[in-house]
Amino acid sequence: MMNKIVLDENEIPKKWYNINPDLPSPLPEPKNPEGGKNIENLPRVFSRGVLEQEMSMERWIKIPREVMDVYKMIGRPTPLFRAKGLEEMLDTPARIYYKREDYSPTGSHKLNTAIAQAYYARKDGAERLTTETGAGQWGTALSLACSLMDLQCKVYMVRVSFNQKPFRKTIMQLYGGEVVPSPSNHTEFGRRMLKEDPEHPGSLGIAISEAMEEALQEENVYYSLGSVLNHVLLHQTVIGLETKKQLEIAGETPDIMIGCVGGGSNFGGAIFPFVKDKLDGKLDCEFIAAEPKSCPTLTAGEYRYDFGDTAGMTPLLKMYTLGHDFVPPSVHAGGLRYHGMSPQVALLVREGVINARAVPQHTIFESGVKFAKAEGVVPAPETCHAISVAIDEARKCRETGEEKTIVISFSGHGLLDLKGYGDYLEGKI
């Protein structure tokens, strides 16, 4: 029995996997709103490299050498662990594995795309990147990536998370990022939101609008997105491609794969290489997207065209949405407080390839504490959603006696999210 499966540096995937040509039905194209030029504005805020990847129908896209060098520097490939302690705690015949994206220097999967986006922006002559962040994982990753690529970085951090997680601001600043709470006085849209509500908690949709507004108005400034779009999920497929090799080494075939979803990047990156096998009839695996009960995009949203941001600056995307003006409750899983979803993930849910479940905040912290006690690793509140669903599935196996193989995308650690755990332990959640 292998408790940890580690790959060599030379086993980092050489290419990213693009699921677009393998989707079960064509992906609906982005649209302009009536009278708008949102699509035409994209080359003003995104680098050529990521825009080409966004619409590409090539199945495999080579990872540039400079990006590969940084992947090695930050510790890829990441290990796959067997959760023996959790299995014993639950007394389940299921075998549980978790892919350790928390091994990254910034503590989550986000660097996989931050490095690539910063590389392509620098190649285009950008001097600065603007972005949004919820819990701070994405802002932290882009701050480091910009530092490594000799770029400036400005992060609009959702106000409720800015207040909940002060050390996230510190680490972003340590890497050279400028951090402002969103909504802010730095943009016209932010000022409008604050005028309506001076205590506005913010949302990812608002922060995206602010970051895009700044990028549109200034020269040599690009916008960088942490989730949702195809190029982001494409970069994250290094997770799933590595996991595939590691499960083969362990002699395992996954029966259930689980990840948390906000915009869908860690989940999509983890499962897309396996989704292709399922669509090709080579794999019988259930894919479960775990989302917050307070922001139930997949389980309660509508499948329709909507903006990716609150101000309506992005093109209209066909996805599950709660409405671009939806402001989620101020939960601790700030990285999942998003109204929309990756169009690819949304289409696969619509087609019945992916299932979705919504989990309440109290339950996710209960699951996180169990995992920490069993495995010694403190999961991020976002990651706890996936762990909670995995625990439910492992308990079902205990009842049925089935020896299923369950794989969790462990998207990040929670060492900078301890206020949420503290509130849970003190009975405030």
Curated annotation (Swiss-Prot):
Annotated SUPFAM superfamilies: Tryptophan synthase beta subunit-like PLP-dependent enzymes
EC numbers for this chain: 4.2.1.20
Gene3D superfamilies: 3.40.50.1100
One Pfam family recorded for the sequence: PALP
Gene Ontology terms, MF aspect: L-serine hydro-lyase (adding indole, L-tryptophan-forming) activity; pyridoxal phosphate binding; tryptophan synthase activity
Cofactor: pyridoxal 5'-phosphate
Record pathway: Amino-acid biosynthesis; L-tryptophan biosynthesis; L-tryptophan from chorismate: step 5/5
Disulfide bond annotation, renumbered to this chain: none
Region annotated Disordered, chain positions: 18-40
A GO term from the CC aspect: cytoplasm
Reaction(s) catalysed by this chain's protein: (1S,2R)-1-C-(indol-3-yl)glycerol 3-phosphate + L-serine = D-glyceraldehyde 3-phosphate + L-tryptophan + H2O
Sequence similarity: Belongs to the TrpB family.
Assembly and oligomerization: Tetramer of two alpha and two beta chains.
Free-text function comment from the UniProt entry: The beta subunit is responsible for the synthesis of L-tryptophan from indole and L-serine.
NCBIfam families: PRK12391.1, trpB_rel
Protein's name in the database: Tryptophan synthase beta chain 2
Chain's gene name: trpB2
